[in-house]
Curated annotation (Swiss-Prot):
It is found in: Cell inner membrane. The gene is btuD. This is Vitamin B12 import ATP-binding protein BtuD. It comes from Vibrio vulnificus (strain CMCP6). Its EC number is 7.6.2.8. Pfam families: ABC_tran (PF00005).
Length: 254
């Protein structure tokens, strides 16, 4: 996938990067650095009236030139937390998220739904109204739904999953399920782009990191390359140390 000179007015200055199928790309940066703007621009939810320029190429398909309904064949996008717009049960919400126009055998559909529901641990909530869910439960339903849209066995054309701060409403245990879900989607061959404030998660989980500051691309590459002490101190304006605990690298902000 190629992102070429994507920009949004003065909120996001032109930037370009490439990523390969199956890569997990994490977008990091301070509040107001342009993370959500970048993700919504890639997802095609911003219009040219909002100053969006550039292109998103997926296997030579120019994503942003397609109508939103056609874009949804190739990519799924989870914006930041929102409440349910209408009252349905969880299983109905998931059914609404299944790809349309695909002739997939019912056992395959059931297997995909069962796997996603297991990954987000919502087996006992399928017949509960979405209006009765807690914030963390609703976020897990949203995650399951957006993944079903681009689940490879249901939608062989899917290429990209975009998640904007998906861990924000989740507790520690629920966040663990989220990262397992991200791994599952990447293993299916999708590019997964995630905005995340938890820099230790970014450092430990990302294949590539895109570091933004005030709408400008500061660095892009492997986690070790991008999340250097020098880069992090420059962008976040706070002292940083790297330590290892039981062989696992961690960042400490002092």
């Amino acid at each position: 996938m190629h992102i070429n000179y994507i920009s949004v007015g003065n909120r996001l200055l032109p930037l370009s990067f490439q990523c390969a199928a199956g890569e997990k790309v994490y977008v990091a940066g301070p509040n107001g650095s342009g993370k959500s703007t970048l993700l919504s621009a890639i997802a095609g939810t911003l219009s040219s009236r909002e100053g969006v320029k550039g292109e998103v190429l997926i296997n030579e398909t120019s994503l942003l030139t397609l109508p939103l309904a056609e874009q949804a064949i190739y990519r799924a996008y989870l914006c930041q937390q929102s409440r349910p717009a209408f009252n349905v049960d969880v299983f109905q919400m998931l059914a609404l998220s299944l790809p349309v126009g695909r002739h997939v055998a019912e056992p395959e559909v059931q297997a995909a739904v069962r796997r996603v529901v297991e990954l987000v641990q919502m087996q006992d909530k399928l017949h509960r109204s979405v209006q009765a869910l807690s914030g963390g439960e609703w976020q897990r339903v949203r995650l399951a739904a957006v993944c079903l849209q681009v689940w490879r066995s249901l939608n062989p054309y899917s290429q990209l999953l975009i998640l904007d701060e998906p861990a924000a409403p989740l507790d520690v245990a629920q966040a663990k399920w989220l990262y397992q879900l991200i791994d599952e989607m990447a293993a299916q061959g999708l590019v997964v782009i995630v905005a995340n404030h938890d820099l230790n998660r970014v450092y430990q989980h990302a294949d590539k990191v895109l570091l933004l500051n005030q709408g400008v691309l500061t660095a892009y590459g492997s986690a070790d390359e991008v999340m250097s002490v020098e880069n992090l101190q420059q962008v976040f304006e706070t002292p940083v140390k790297k330590v290892a605990v039981d062989g696992q690298p961690y960042l400490i902000f002092t």
